[in-house]
Design a protein with these regions (language model features):
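Acidic, glycine/proline-rich low-complexity segments that act as flexible tails and inter-domain linkers
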Residues: 1-56, 110-135
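Short, structured motif recognition centered on aromatic/hydrophobic residues
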Residues: 58-66, 96-97
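Extended intrinsically disordered, low-complexity coil regions enriched in Ser, Thr, Gly, Ala
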Residues: 72-92, 109-119
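C-terminal structural segments of small proteins and small subunits
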Residues: 103-107
Length: 135
């Protein structure tokens, strides 16, 4: 029997990532099943289920953190999809990345943007051509 934290976490994960999140956990079953449980119980059961931030706000923070870390493209892919699933627009995702340029530099922002581009293409999402720079 799974813990209450696991049940809450799995519910949060399904709301954000649908079947994609569960697939990530399933890939760990044969090598590190406890790691999958930790992700569900701690990240989603304890952290994502807290009051005070919406799922949209949590996903913006998550994709920003993953961009900042760098080298997290698989996790960034999961959370960009999650961001879209909870109603964040592609434009807001890209604008969030652009905001990071002065703090983390072009290479990390470019890497994250290319992950987003792949996901947007897979989901047939088209961004507007407006640069939104006020010039």
């Amino acid at each position: 029997m799974k813990s209450k934290r696991f049940e809450i976490g799995l519910e949060q994960l399904q709301e954000i990532d649908g079947a994609s999140g569960e697939k990530v956990i399933q890939t760990l079953e044969d090598i590190a099943p406890d790691l999958g449980e930790y992700i569900i119980e701690f990240a989603f059961g304890d952290i994502y289920s807290r009051q005070g931030l919406s799922l949209q706000e949590r996903e913006v923070i998550t994709i920003t953190s993953l961009l900042t870390l760098g080298g997290c493209e698989p996790q960034l892919e999961v959370h960009i999809n999650g961001s879209l699933n909870v109603g964040i627009s592609p434009e807001k995702i890209i604008e969030t990345f652009i905001q990071c340029i002065p703090y983390v530099g072009f290479p990390k922002v470019l890497n994250a943007t290319f992950v987003a581009k792949k996901i947007f293409s897979e989901r047939n999402l088209i961004l507007g051509s407006n640069t939104n720079d006020g010039r």
